[in-house]
Amino acid sequence: MNNTFPLILAPMAGVTDKAFRHMCKKHGADRLVTEMVSAKAVCFGDEKTAILAHIDSGERPCSLQLFGSEPDIMAKAAVICAEKFTPDAIDVNMGCPAPKIVNNGDGSAVMKSPELAYEIIARMRDALDGGGFSDMPLTVKMRSGFDSAHINAVEVALMCEKGGAAEVTVHGRTREQMYAP
């Protein structure tokens, strides 16, 4: 494996479950990411969410991906996840294009407001730092923009960096493009 550019498994709801992550690790993935999990469900202690979020020793390094759009809930969920699931990083989903996610203001809908993106990351960073997890990397997965009239990945990425994100990954399509080739 050429480690100049690490092979990182992209988080995909309904795909990157524990069995798939183990298979990818076996075949050379350098870094894994869980399926996205709801910050609200984490805060409510949902059992199905706990199963999705569980990371075992054979999956390391592995990030846990959270989605949500309420800064306080995202912050609380980040600390719960750091304590309960001990991920190697926490990734924030600002890229999911699914209508049921976007219609709630989550996923790629967050990109409509760079200020909200900043607030989410800043609150999460503060909560992690205050909870004893200052060494926990906070990363973001986003799209190039919400639609072709709003290509704002650079602006949102800079706001996330200002808020405390250590890394940003850009899916080179807009929400409008969904998964089109």
Q: How does the language model describe each region?
A:
Residues 1-181:
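Flavin-dependent oxidoreductase catalytic cores
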